[in-house]
């Protein structure tokens, strides 16, 4: 493992990126950055509110700016939002500069986790089914 590269946690919504990222950073004595949390603090809105009030395009533009900034931080663990890796610029930059770790779970596990969390912006209707 290249000890000079950041660790970036990727995965679908509900895969545990934030939880595992925090624990991994603590274990490795590194700083931890959750890009969704950083965006929420910056805009003073929850991710679901940003989607609702400003739309996904605006959110993805903001996400891109934040993620690219944090990919350049020295030696840290970064949790990306569930859809961040879809962006080609983010994906290429992360693959070039970081060690990317995909957290993979079954669809059933992800859906069960997401249904328990009312803050998930793209799947709020799952709770009604």
Feature map (PLM): residue ranges:
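Phosphate-binding P-loop
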Residues: 1-4, 69-70
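Hydrophobic anchor at the beta1->P-loop junction of P-loop NTPases
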Residues: 9
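P-loop (Walker A) phosphate-binding loop of NTP-binding proteins
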Residues: 12
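Walker A/P-loop
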Residues: 18
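ATP-dependent small-molecule kinase phosphotransfer cores
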Residues: 31-95, 120-121
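A glycine- and Lys/Arg-enriched "phosphate-lid" helix/loop adjacent to the NTP-binding pocket
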Residues: 97-129
């Amino acid at each position: 493992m290249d000890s000079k590269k950041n660790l970036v946690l990727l995965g679908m919504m509900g895969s545990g990126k934030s939880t595992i990222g925090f624990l991994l950073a603590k274990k490795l004595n590194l700083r931890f950055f959750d890009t969704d949390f950083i965006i929420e603090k910056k805009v003073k809105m929850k991710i679901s509110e940003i989607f609702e009030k400003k739309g996904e395009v605006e959110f993805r533009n903001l996400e891109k700016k934040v993620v690219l900034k944090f990919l350049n931080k020295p030696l840290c663990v970064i949790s990306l939002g569930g859809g961040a890796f879809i962006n080609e610029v983010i994906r290429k930059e992360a693959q070039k500069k970081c060690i990317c770790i995909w957290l993979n779970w079954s669809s059933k596990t992800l859906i069960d986790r997401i249904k328990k969390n009312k803050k998930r912006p793209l799947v709020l209707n799952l709770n009604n089914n």
